[in-house]
């Protein structure tokens, strides 16, 4: 028997006799740009049909807005699907949790009408804790960088992930175990940070007393989420994952170092929830009809002009978490091709198309070029290279009529439909939904 035949037999054997362990799949919603694409609204729309909604990474540096029954909810740690009282919300092991912020968020949204959270929120016992001193260190590190700051949210996310990576972080499960052991670990991690940052001041005894109270408050919510999710999949439960931040903020694939401290791409879903690759079903890339970015870092299609101002004003582009104005620019196809390559989008939700309604013409970035005019066949791997590219634009006619009341794709202006089809054609990924307003009712089903 030849080597190729032998290899073929081995490969065939590899795929024979597979048993279907899971009765359902995990669908994933991911931001395809630099965040603020409208993931929360998409999750809210889909959550009405699922059993479980999960957060897998990040912390309260994320900000999602959901409008339900005329009420606007702001979420930072809670999954956006929590507004659906029929589904369970899971905060996975890959999330870092600042407990004071979590309970503040719960109280604020309960005041707006969020109900019965105690029966449908589950927090992983393996999630790491963010402490106040992490936030102080975050602010100090940003201040030290001066004009070269990264524009972080100063929520302590980076320092908490640093503690996790250096193996001196503290997990939720440890808070709920032997409190004497928790106290020892807490004193140790504080001592380490004070040694590195002598100006921070931590009242250790006061913090321990505070966290003893938090242990009692958080205890009813905490479970082994890995077992919970695998049991749910074996029982055919439908699961939706809400990625925080976005692909271009991913610690590995984003515009490093102007990124967040976790994997906001598809890989972060697996590691942040303890799921194997074969459980993944649909991967929905959420794309804003133009591009925005909060904070510092390269932005090839940014418009520092009247167009940028118009997009910022019409789109109400202010960060949910930071309250900073977002930088605005044209849609960037090379960027989206790159994030689609990394994440494997199976479909797209295009949001905020209505913000472009008043423009007589619309530009779309279709290629990056080197200074010598040569087109790039890859997304630049360094900010130096990205800062040195030239952008080639396609100029499309606008539609100059309101799309806000449109609820059928074929009723959109012809030029608006062409804009959607261009994105579909360039990415070779179907656009399944188009958003033309704030509420969930303003999302058009394309197919």
Curated annotation (Swiss-Prot):
If you read the UniProt record, what top EC class would you report for this enzyme, in one word? ligase
**Keywords assigned by UniProt, alphabetized:** Cytoplasm, GTP-binding, Ligase, Magnesium, Metal-binding, Nucleotide-binding, Purine biosynthesis
Give the matching PROSITE patterns.
Answer: ADENYLOSUCCIN_SYN_1, ADENYLOSUCCIN_SYN_2
**Binding residues annotated for Mg(2+), in chain numbering:** 36, 63
Q: Where in the cell is it found?
A: Cytoplasm
**Superkingdom of the source?**
Eukaryota
Give the annotated active site: 36 (proton acceptor), 64 (proton donor)
Predominant place of localization: cytoplasm
Pfam families associated with the record? Adenylsucc_synt
Q: Which residues bind substrate?
A: 320-326
Instruction: Tell me the route in metabolism or biology where this protein functions.
Output: Purine metabolism; AMP biosynthesis via de novo pathway; AMP from IMP: step 1/2
Residues bound to IMP: 36-39, 61-64, 153, 167, 245, 260, 324
Per its record, the protein catalyses: IMP + L-aspartate + GTP = N(6)-(1,2-dicarboxyethyl)-AMP + GDP + phosphate + 2 H(+)
- KO phenotype (gene knockout): Mutant flies show life span extension and increased activity. Heterozygous mutants show increased ratios of AMP:ATP (3 to 4-fold) and ADP:ATP (2-fold), also observed in response to caloric restriction, and associated with life span extension phenotypes in yeast and worms.
Record EC number: 6.3.4.4
Q: Which cofactor does it need?
A: Mg(2+)
Q: Which GO terms describe its cellular component?
A: cytoplasm
Q: Which GO terms of type biological process are on file?
A: 'de novo' AMP biosynthetic process; IMP metabolic process
Q: Which note does the record give on the cofactor?
A: Binds 1 Mg(2+) ion per subunit.
Q: How does it assemble?
A: Homodimer.
Name of this protein = Adenylosuccinate synthetase
Gene name of this polypeptide: Adss
């Amino acid at each position: 028997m030849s080597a190729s035949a032998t290899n073929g037999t081995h490969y065939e054997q590899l795929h024979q006799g597979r048993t279907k362990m899971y009765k359902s799949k995990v669908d994933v919603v991911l931001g395809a740009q630099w965040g603020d694409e409208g993931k929360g609204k998409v999750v809210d729309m889909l959550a009405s049909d699922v059993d479980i909604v999960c957060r897998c990474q990040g912390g309260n540096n994320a900000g999602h807005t959901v409008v339900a029954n005329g009420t606007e909810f702001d979420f930072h740690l809670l999954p956006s699907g929590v507004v659906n009282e029929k589904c369970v919300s899971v905060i996975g092991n890959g999330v870092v949790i600042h407990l004071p912020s979590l309970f503040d968020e719960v109280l604020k949204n309960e005041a707006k009408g969020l109900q019965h959270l105690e029966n449908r929120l589950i927090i992983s016992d393996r999630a790491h804790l963010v402490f106040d001193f992490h936030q102080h260190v975050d602010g100090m590190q940003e201040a030290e960088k001066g004009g070269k700051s990264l524009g972080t949210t100063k929520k302590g996310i980076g320092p908490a992930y640093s503690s996790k990576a250096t193996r001196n972080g503290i997990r939720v499960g440890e808070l709920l175990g032997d409190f004497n052991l928790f106290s020892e670990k807490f004193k140790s991690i504080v001592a380490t940070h004070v040694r590195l940052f002598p100006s921070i001041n931590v009242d250790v005894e006061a913090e321990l007393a505070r966290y003893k109270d938090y242990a009692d408050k958080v205890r009813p919510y905490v479970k082994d989420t890995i077992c919970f999710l695998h049991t749910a999949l074996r029982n055919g439960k439908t699961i939706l994952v809400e990625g925080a931040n976005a692909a271009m903020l991913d610690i590995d694939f984003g515009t490093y170092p102007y990124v967040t401290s976790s994997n906001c791409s598809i890989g972060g879903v697996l590691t942040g929830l303890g799921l194997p690759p074969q459980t993944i079903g649909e991967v929905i890339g959420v794309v804003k009809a133009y591009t925005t970015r909060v904070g510092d870092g390269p932005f090839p299609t940014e418009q520092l002009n009247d167009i940028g101002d118009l997009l910022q004003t019409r789109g109400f582009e202010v960060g949910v978490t930071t309250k900073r104005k977002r930088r605005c620019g044209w849609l960037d196809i090379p960027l989206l091709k790159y994030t689609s390559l990394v994440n494997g989008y199976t479909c797209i939700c295009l949001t905020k198309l209505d913000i472009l309604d008043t423009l007589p013409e619309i530009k779309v970035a279709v290629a990056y070029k080197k200074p010598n005019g040569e087109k790039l066949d890859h997304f630049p791997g360094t900010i130096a290279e990205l800062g040195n590219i030239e952008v080639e634009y396609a100029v499309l006619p606008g539609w100059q009529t309101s799309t806000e009341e449109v609820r059928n794709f074929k009723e959109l202006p012809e030029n608006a439909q062409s804009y959607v089809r261009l994105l579909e054609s360039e990415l070779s990924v179907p656009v399944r939904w188009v958003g033309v307003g704030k509420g969930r009712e303003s999302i058009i089903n394309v197919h």
